[in-house]
Amino acid sequence: MRRAAVVAAVGALVAGFAVYGSAQAQEDPARDASGATAASLREAAAASGTFVGTAINDGLLSNPTYANIAASEFSSVTAENAMKWDTTEPSRGNFNFSGGDRLVDFANRNLHQVYGHTLVWHSQLPGWVQNGGFNAEQLNQVMVDHIDAVAGHFSGELAYWDVVNEVFNDDGSMRQSVFQTTIGTEYIANAFRAADAADPWANLCINDYNVEGINAKSDALYDLVSSLLDQGVPIDCVGLQSHLILGQVPGDLQENMQRFADLGLEVIITELDIRMDLPADSGKLAQQAEDYAEVVTACMNVPACEGITVWGISDRDSWVPGVFPGQGAACVWDESYQPKPAYDGMLTAFGG
């Protein structure tokens, strides 16, 4: 990939952090409680040639336990909300980068790479865009201007950008977002070209959920990505969100990742969590550990799978219970920031 040098440089920083991380080990409550003191997730992933990341709520970085786990256990951080459109450009031409800047500063201090999320998405879109009444030419310019400002602001600071997010319905049809209905499918290529112009250093990704296995939706994604590549659109990677259900890791996950890799693309597990019916018990937690390990193993078996990001650190702060009533316990750390069996499952699968 033409941006490989940037990622390689980040990898060198991550490897260098291993010494620092080892020195912290006895002060890291997550590692002490897990009983797995040979390595952190960060060290184990680096040794395997991959990154391991987490979504970060920049407002929680003032919590020292949260910040310490983020710093010591992960090599990549994704902005949970701080880089989304409703935050970065709540009104036209008025930009707010404070949350994203805090995340980049935290990443720089802890030798993390930064994964930008997301430039164009149908959700968390401010009303002035959603209901602006723009025609196709106008909305395309609004989108390009937004990408130019946001990706341009962080240019050279990020390893990856989710350029477009969740463009498909589950049946493989195009989601009827304001961009799709107004501009047409070409908005996707336009967004990638704009992102490439604004930040030629970041790897540019398309990201979606329920595309982990081979199904109508992932087939549609595969066809779209193939078409973009045929058009010479600067796309570098495919993000598989991987918001999974206990015991339901797709059996063809590895095969699915490999077919995207065979197109010459990187593949990233971008938003991994594995939810269960509450309350959690020892049996469910053991199954969850197996599931997390299965995802890591699938990634490790596909050389183009560059890394795995979990969607949040602790069950305390997870999005899952608010969206799926009666379900939760989806993260690797529990509500008290203690590591669950899933931690050791991931660590072992990484080779730690």
Residue ranges and their predicted role:
Residues 1-26:
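Secretory targeting and sorting signals
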Residues 31-80:
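Boundary/entry segment of secreted carbohydrate-active catalytic domains
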Residues 52-57, 162-163, 189-218, 268-271, ...:
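Aromatic-lined carbohydrate-recognition surfaces of secreted/lumenal glycan-active proteins
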Residues 55-67, 85-98, 168-173, 211-220, ...:
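Acidic-and-aromatic substrate-binding clefts and catalytic sites of carbohydrate-active enzymes
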Residues 57-73, 140-150, 216-228, 253, ...:
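Short, acidic/polar
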Residues 72-90, 98-211:
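Substrate-binding cleft and catalytic face of glycoside hydrolase catalytic domains
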Residues 74-81, 165, 198-208, 221-248, ...:
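Aromatic- and acid-rich polysaccharide-binding/catalytic face
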Residues 118, 203-211, 242-243, 260-292, ...:
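Active-site clefts of carbohydrate-active enzymes
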